[in-house]
C-alpha cells in the first residue's frame, strides 16, 4: 500500500519519543525528591504512582550499575566500583534505556565518556569502553558455524568474484591508545598483574596505537591483536569489499595465508561467497 512504510516509520518514531519521555519523567522525579512530573501524574493515580516512584528511586541506581557493569567490566575496574556507580547513574539520567532488555542499553556510553569533562585525564577510557562494548555485543550475537565446504571457492574463483563472510558480531576496534594491552592487564591473575601493569604504564608513556579484532570462541568473546595491514584487510571485509579489493587495501605487507590460519583457529570466518553482482 503506498505510504504504508512511511506511516509505520512515523508510528515507530512516535513510540520511541513517547518511551523516551516516559523514562525522563521517571528520572526527573527520581532526581527531585517529592516532585512528580505532570505527564506521570496524568498516567498514574496518586498512591500507585508514589509507590512505583519510590521503588524506582530505590532500584534505579543499582539497576544502572549492574547493567552497565556487565557490559563495561574493564572500565568499571579501571575507574573503581564507586565512581562507576556514579557514572552509571549519570548516564541513566541522560540516556535512559528504551527497551526492557537492558543488555541492549549502553551503546552510547563510550561516546558519552569521550565527552565527559571529568574523564579528560583518561583520554584512553572511551576506547577501552568501545572494546568492552564490542566484546559484549559479540557475546550476544547470533550463533553460526563455519561453512567449511565454501573454502574450496578460493581455489576455483577469481578473487574479484569472491567475498569472505565473517562470523556474526565480529568487531574491529582501532585506537591511538594501547587498548589491547590495557584490557589484557585487567584479565590476568593477581600474581602476574604487577608486570602487566608495568607494560601498560610504558605503553601509555609513549602512546602506541593498537587495533584488535573481537570474535567469539565457544561462548566467550576474545580479543585478537592485529597489525596495520590486517586491520585494513578486516575493515575492507566488514565494509563488504570483494576479496581482490580487500587484498589491495591491505597492501603488500599482508599475509593472507597467515590470516586465514588465524581466522579458522579463532572462529573469525563464517565462509566464502561468490559475488552475484
Language-model regions: role of each:
Residues 1-2, 213:
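N-terminal cationic amphipathic segment used for targeting or macromolecule association
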Amino acid at each position: 500500500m503506498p505510504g504504508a512504510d512511511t506511516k509505520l516509520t512515523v508510528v515507530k518514531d512516535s513510540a520511541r519519543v513517547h518511551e523516551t519521555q516516559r523514562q525522563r519523567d521517571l528520572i526527573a522525579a527520581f532526581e527531585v525528591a517529592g516532585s512528580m512530573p505532570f505527564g506521570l501524574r496524568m498516567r498514574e493515580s496518586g498512591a500507585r504512582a508514589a509507590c512505583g516512584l519510590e521503588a524506582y528511586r530505590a532500584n534505579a541506581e543499582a539497576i544502572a550499575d549492574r547493567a552497565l557493569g556487565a557490559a563495561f567490566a574493564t572500565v568499571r575496574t579501571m575507574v573503581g566500583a564507586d565512581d562507576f556507580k556514579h557514572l552509571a547513574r549519570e548516564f541513566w539520567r541522560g540516556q535512559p534505556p528504551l527497551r526492557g532488555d537492558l543488555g541492549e542499553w549502553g551503546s552510547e556510553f563510550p561516546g558519552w565518556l569521550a565527552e565527559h569533562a571529568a574523564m579528560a585525564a583518561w583520554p584512553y577510557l572511551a576506547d577501552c569502553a568501545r572494546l568492552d562494548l564490542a566484546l559484549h555485543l559479540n557475546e550476544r550475537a547470533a550463533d553460526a558455524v563455519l561453512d567449511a565446504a565454501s573454502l574450496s571457492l578460493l581455489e576455483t574463483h577469481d578473487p574479484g568474484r569472491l567475498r569472505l563472510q565473517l562470523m556474526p558480531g565480529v568487531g574491529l576496534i582501532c585506537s591511538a591508545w594501547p587498548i589491547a594491552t590495557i584490557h589484557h592487564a585487567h584479565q590476568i591473575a593477581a600474581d602476574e598483574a604487577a608486570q602487566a601493569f608495568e607494560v601498560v604504564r610504558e605503553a601509555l608513556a609513549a602512546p602506541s596505537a593498537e587495533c584488535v579484532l573481537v570474535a567469539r570462541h565457544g561462548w566467550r568473546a576474545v580479543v585478537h591483536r592485529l597489525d596495520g595491514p590486517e586491520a585494513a584487510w578486516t575493515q575492507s571485509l566488514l565494509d563488504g569489499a570483494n576479496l581482490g579489493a580487500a587484498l589491495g587495501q591491505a597492501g603488500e605487507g599482508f599475509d593472507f595465508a597467515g590470516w586465514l590460519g588465524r581466522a579458522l583457529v579463532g572462529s573469525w570466518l563464517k565462509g566464502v561467497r561468490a559475488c552475484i553482482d
